[in-house]
Amino acid sequence: MSVACVLKRKAVLWQDSFSPHLKQHAQDTANPNMPVVLTSGTGSQAQPQPAANQALAAGTHSSPVPGSIGVAGRSQDDAMVDYFFQRQHGEQLGGGGSGGGGYNNSKHRWPTGDNIHAEHQVRSMDELNHDFQALALEGRAMGEQLLPGKKFWESDDSSKDGPKGIFLGDQWRDSAWGTSDHSVSQPIMVQRRPGQGFHVNSEVNSVLSPRSESGGLGVSMVEYVLSSSPGDSCLRKGGFGPRDAENDENDKGDKKNKGTFDGDKLGDLKEEGDVMDKTNGLPVQNGIDTDVKDFSRTPGNCQNSASEVDLLGPNQNGSEGLAQLASTNGAKPVEDFSNIESQSVPLDPMEHVGMEPLQFDYSGTQVPVDSAAATVGLFDYNSQQQLFQRPNALAVQQLTAAQQQQYALAAAHQPHIAGLAPAAFVPNPYIISAAPPGTDPYAAGLAAAATLGPAVVPHQYYGVTPWGVYPASLFQQQAAAAAAATNSANQQTTQQTQQGQQQVLRGGASQRPLTPNQNQQGQQTDPLVAAAAVNSALAFGQGLAAGMPGYPVLAPAAYYDQTGALVVNAGARNGLGAPVRLVAPAPVIISSSAAQAAVAAAAASANGAAGGLAGTTNGPFRPLGTQQPQPQPQQQPTNNLASSSFYGNNSLSSNSQSSSLFSQGSAQPANTSLGFGSSSSLGATLGSALGGFGTAVANSNTGSGSRRDSLTGSSDLYKRTSSSLTPIGHSFYNGLGFSSSPGPVGMPLPSQGPGHSQTPPPSLSSHGSSSSLNLGGLTNGSGRYISAAPGAEAKYRSASSASSLFSPSSTLFPSSRLRYGMSDVMPSGRSRLLEDFRNNRYPNLQLREIAGHIMEFSQDQHGSRFIQLKLERATPAERQLVFNEILQAAYQLMVDVFGNYVIQKFFEFGSLEQKLALAERIRGHVLSLALQMYGCRVIQKALEFIPPDQQVINEMVRELDGHVLKCVKDQNGNHVVQKCIECVQPQSLQFIIDAFKGQVFALSTHPYGCRVIQRILEHCLPEQTLPILEELHQHTEQLVQDQYGNYVIQHVLEHGRPEDKSKIVAEIRGNVLVLSQHKFASNVVEKCVTHASRTERAMLIDEVCTMNDGPHSALYTMMKDQYANYVVQKMIDVAEPAQRKIVMHKIRPHIATLRKYTYGKHILAKLEKYYMKNGVDLGPICGPPNGII
């Protein structure tokens, strides 16, 4: 096995070259699984203590002085590194690619899975993998990437072959782990070689960590500490004492490339902004103070400044330092961390990265992790939360760093799990189904999602919080691996503890984001750590190793080859194996009430472990208490190692084999966890039950529970209440409660406060049916993408928490079409269902399929039209379905620009009961609705389609009493009054007639009032219209010349009684010539000629023919007039033959002149038509040439 040489910083232990006897001594002095802690000085010595603490003391908190370690410079031969690499059994010569090359060639700190093994011979495959990376870094220097043992520092001239940073290229010029574009001060992403972890001839789950014992830890230590240290500059500096800045003047340029941290260089840096801003050749972007800015991010850099050591004290071991830095249970006030900004604490003597601790706003009291003996927390967060309780604003760079802390957390312990062959594990931690090579990766994911559960995103696509990448086969792998590994796991407990402690990413009293369990490390909870390591390996199989309680990592067993085909578990492959942390480092809390309700609902709807929701101990969900659980005493991890909790924060007793997702407090029995028993099928469990992995919990305001609310930003739209959890299994998303993502790629937006955590977005398919792999989106049964947008749980935050974990039908499998919720809000504000409908993704959508969305559809232009069309042909049951949803919010729809049409359709096609129910909703709001643009239409429809004998109609109309004139003069209300006059029995409208008394002339000249007067004249009783007509006759002369009043007079002439017509004609007589030339009155004269009696008509025509207008007759004047010519035309049409002949003879002398006038031509055209039709010969129409008659 690999032997880690963990070095204390008290003495120079390695000479300028590799010493074979020293290496041999390291092998001889340690067990195969124990790290060789070589130390001298007053620090914590390598005593025969539990190996985990041994590694912790040496690798976590020891603070080597500048120059104490890392003597070997660039002059060191790479073959020496390979010589050390050969210490790993089953490892090829170039295996250093996992240890040295893993760091050296890994250009990304993202979980890209590239350049992690020694198999760099296939360059095209390496480049292909990098092309898959969404965050592919440019400037790749393949020639240097292929070096299995790349050094980080150059003692000699760096111009010999360019910068020697592992991120070869202009992206990070000199730094071993330089700042990336996306993240500053990220934890190193120690990536695993699939040849070591997933494939045959190798040890299981070999993921390298800077302080992990196995999987090439010794290789990484030797590679980065010995052969990559700044060589002679380290030897120049001794002890913890500060060194003069003058010593650095000569190699000040080198320091920028070396990225070393020199104790006194702090003084220079504070004066020298040039150096202060350059940590590894690039500016430090995370706002770290000058002391921290010079903090080298190079994992091989073992030099910590005296200022770093002083934080812990020269003689303080790592565990004590951690306890001092962060109180054991996270209760240390934030004030104790005030110096974090200006001081840096050694996180790992092998690796120093100056970085602000992430500020995940976890409450002051951290819930202890599940006892590693009983449940291995895939998300075991010990009470190390205070490291994330920084008040500083959380930067995106720091967030990314925290997201990648898990990458080094991989399989240091894995080779020690009984040395299980990969066959002992379910080989596919990603939900990339074991499809043959050449299969489309996304199509291959369909079957996997159907059987293994949530659709996942291959980690190459998203290096930040791999959304949806959950170990679907978590419990299945656990079952398979537990039996095979029980004996060996017991045997490996001690070693496992050591490696588990070592591989904590940056364990120790560092001020950088730490694994939340390092406090437990300080508390000497080695057996728990060992159990966590063993159980995690058992649970995750070869690719899922969360060796330390803390970040879950998910390493893929499949990759894409050069052709883009999916290769599953097909041997060691270059570019694969980067362990992926699944969720941000915090327990996901489920409120106890919601969890208990879900337990009850599950028990009612499922049958035992196979049914899926019995309160078994092996449950994927576990309610989380908000009290501060007390840390459990150490437990021997050899009792039950088959448990693996997703979000374990419970110290379970060693006899509880709970496989839970959400563990409650230590006092909570394990059998209260929700979910499936160990014998249940995880395909259905993870497919439907685990849809809401990141379901944020409502108890965001509790002072003690760990805070997991992913939406605690300032946006009210995305704020959750603190009352309840989104009920898992309500009627949307097939009963899966999803929480939204705080940022674009799982990162908090810059505007979001420190309270933001990283809840993965719901990229899980909730179907047991086919579901393609998708990037952060949900898919419904037909494979369509259904993205759960922010605020997806808003609708159901106050819903009953007793809902089933699954859909209301209590079935594990959803219906053919996904049930959308109103909470599935898109950025446009529309739900995903409506958005899909608007985009024609549902051409055959039915009313029953939009249940729960009727209100939203009704208020959308296209959705409203859809409902209107469906309602016309809907069955009574379908209409009732729609009606039930709109009734409570009927008024809201009545005043909506599109919703009012849906209400109107119900008045048209609904049953009488539905119409009356809606009418009751109108009652009390008739006036406001009548004056509203859309509400007035609804009232008109109600008045039109509700039988007039219904009492509700009369009651509605009476609400207008006292407001008649206001409504009549309103552009909307006048339509309501007109409809009332048309549809309501006249006896009920007397209040309208009364309101018009004395106002007839004013209303008749009003643009809206004139319409109401006409309706009254049409529909009201004679006794009701008489007073109106009386007022009209008194003002006929004015009304006929009014732009609106003339319509009232015309209406009387058309529909009025003969006596009323005669009165009007009498007013016109004697004024025909004048009124005929009036724009408005000419219309009245036309109507008089048309509707008057024969005698009256003859009198009017004669008046025109006999009257003279100056030298010409009135007829000639009228024929030339733009308005009066229409009166003449009408007279010709309606005159009796004898009178028409007279008119013709009167017109004939003016024919030649009429041709000069535009309007006169109308008269001539009328005459020609008439005479041609009747064959009457009046002689030549054309006059003499001179136009004189």
Swiss-Prot record:
It is found in: Cytoplasm; Cytoplasm, P-body; Cytoplasmic granule. Residues 45-58, 491-503, 627-652, 764-774 have a biased composition (Low complexity). Pfam families: PUF (PF00806). It comes from the Eukaryota. GO terms for molecular function: mRNA 3'-UTR binding. Keywords: Cytoplasm, Repeat, RNA-binding, Translation regulation. Residues 1082-1086, 1083-1086 are annotated as: Guanine-nucleotide binding in RNA target. Sequence-specific RNA-binding protein that acts as a post-transcriptional repressor by binding the 3'-UTR of mRNA targets. Binds to an RNA consensus sequence, the Pumilio Response Element (PRE), 5'-UGUANAUA-3', that is related to the Nanos Response Element (NRE). Mediates post-transcriptional repression of transcripts via different mechanisms: acts via direct recruitment of the CCR4-POP2-NOT deadenylase leading to translational inhibition and mRNA degradation. Also mediates deadenylation-independent repression by promoting accessibility of miRNAs. This is Pumilio homolog 1. It comes from Gallus gallus.
